[in-house]
């Protein structure tokens, strides 16, 4: 591919942004030239439009880049999102099942393009507890691990397996984050405190 044109995109969630870039590679003849999280998250941005993430799509023509940007925007606005684990929205998580990866996340995970993926992110403690539950609930494997703290003070992993197993992992992860939010101090059966 002869790269002649580029398009820039930002949003208030880096993980939604990465998912959107991957979607763009499925819908248009583009590649991801750059993708990076901003430190401390969108709520702590130092300018109005800084967002939490910056992505750059590259393509051969303006039309291809525009098509990729539109696909990314649709993903951001209509599909991928963080969810609240409690009533005051102070604990959020991202548990998104991707039925088939594009070139971007496939390369990042070193898996074949078109593989199912469970994209799991939460605050530090919640992410590690919930990741354990997700791995026990489904036949999936870790293909990328984000040990906390990430640049945005979260953690999690990308898991691959069958589409149904990836969905089961997402569901288990979500339930576990919600459980921690509802019971932040709990003694487990082995006596350890979470």
Where are these regions (language model features)?
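Charge-rich, low-aromatic oligomerization/scaffolding segments with amphipathic character
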Residues: 21, 62-76, 164-177
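Short proline/glycine- and acidic-rich turn/helix-capping motifs at secondary-structure junctions
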Residues: 39-44, 83-99, 149-154, 185-194
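Short, surface-exposed ligand-recognition loops at beta-strand->loop->(often short) alpha-helix junctions
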Residues: 10-16, 119-127
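A common structural junction motif
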Residues: 27-31, 72-81, 138-139, 173-182
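Conserved small/polar residues in nucleotide/adenosyl-binding loops
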Residues: 1-5
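A cross-kingdom feature marking solvent-exposed beta-strand/loop segments within repeated
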Residues: 31-51, 140-149, 153-154
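Short amphipathic alpha-helix segments
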Residues: 17-34, 125-139
